[in-house]
Design a protein with these regions (language model features):
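Short, structured coil segments at secondary-structure junctions
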Residues: 33, 66, 119-120
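Histidine- and aromatic-rich ligand-binding microenvironments
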Residues: 8-9, 39-40, 90-91, 112-113, ...
């Protein structure tokens, strides 16, 4: 799988728990969830803020968050976020997620190619 530290983006988690990922992508995420995986505090906020999830999805998301390691918004992430915002047309939450990956040397698993693909230093895994 390459790098061993993975940050799972909100869109991938939502698709995964909504059973909307292709089978191959679902199996890939299954393998990652067996080990240690990461999310950003932004992912936590986004996941818990969704209104359109059913009870089963809500329970799965809460378990997903509880079993993850959450990166908080630390000073080095803030500094990297500012650099990203100055260099790319990217929304603040996505800039924080990208900065979190860069600072912590994580691969980002996301389907948000439009925003993240333009950051050359970011190791992006597209599902």
């Amino acid at each position: 799988m390459g790098r061993k530290d993975f940050l799972i983006d909100t869109n991938v988690a939502i698709y995964y728990f909504g059973l909307a990922l292709p089978k191959e992508s679902e199996k890939y995420i299954d393998q990652i969830l067996v080990g240690k995986y990461f999310i950003s505090v932004i992912n936590r906020i986004e996941l818990l803020g969704f209104k359109e999830i059913n009870k089963n999805e809500s329970e799965a998301i809460n378990s997903f968050i509880a079993n993850s390691t959450i990166f908080d918004l630390e000073e080095d992430i803030i500094i990297e976020t500012i650099k990203i915002r100055k260099n790319y047309a990217i929304k603040l939450p996505d800039a924080i997620i990208a900065a979190t990956c860069l600072v912590n040397n994580c691969s980002l698993i996301s389907n948000n190619i439009k925003d993240f693909d333009k950051i050359a230093r970011l190791h992006l895994i597209k599902l």
